[in-house]
Amino acid sequence: MRDKIKLVSTAGTGHFYTTTKNKKTTPDKLEMKKFDPKVRKHVMYREDKIK
């Protein structure tokens, strides 16, 4: 089953993306570079729980 996750910007702007991931195939936390429109740059985004 795919679970919903939140990808939070490491730039400290509070911007986030929501996506899904399969926890069986990727048990570790996701990290990827995505565009942060608040700083207008590509920065690292880390997985966080959706509350």
Swiss-Prot record:
GO annotations under biological process? translation
Which Pfam families does its entry note? Ribosomal_L33 (PF00471)
Keyword tRNA-binding in annotation: no
One Gene Ontology cellular component: cytosolic large ribosomal subunit
PROSITE patterns, from UniProt? RIBOSOMAL_L33
Q: Which GO terms describe its molecular function?
A: structural constituent of ribosome
Its transmembrane ranges are none
Name the source's superkingdom.
Answer: Bacteria
Q: Which UniProt keywords apply?
A: Ribonucleoprotein, Ribosomal protein
HAMAP family membership: Ribosomal_bL33
Protein family (similarity comment): Belongs to the bacterial ribosomal protein bL33 family.
For this entry, the protein name equals Large ribosomal subunit protein bL33
